[in-house]
Amino acid sequence: MSNVAKRINIVSIKMVKESSFLYQTRTISSPNDAYEMIREQLEGLDREQFMIACLNTKNEPTNISVVAVGTLNKAIVHPREVFKTAILSNAASIIAFHNHPSGETTPSQQDIQLTNRLYEAGELHGIKLLDHLIIGDGTFTSLKEKGYL
């Protein structure tokens, strides 16, 4: 058995602001408020993107994070990646968003399953998933309004 010492790194984790945009409504109080905040970021893209908005205790967005960029019809999303930014942001809650490049906003079975996984993971972390919006051509579907949350 070797008694050779092993070096352990001391690290820090930081978030870096990449850009920003103005948003008039300070508090998110409805799915439409959330859609108005994110629509310019997700409409018209040629591949799926999955994003989250981190909110404080007053339901004010503190940041938006791109979690995954996928292909024409799917993006691979893992709860670990979703909650990484939320934890670093000290978020009280999150809203999930992704686009459907086809413009059709009907949730797929995979969309519903992911929403359920994110809800459960949020409960474990103490970060509530308020909604999951699917963004299409000038429209959106709220999975909360559809009864999936």
What are these regions (language model features)?
Residues 1-14, 24, 33-36, 56-58, ...:
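Active-site-proximal loop/helix of nucleotide/amide-processing enzymes and allied scaffolds
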Residues 8-66:
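Long amphipathic N-terminal alpha/beta scaffold segment
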Residues 69:
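Glycine-rich nucleotide-phosphate-binding loops and adjacent flexible coil segments
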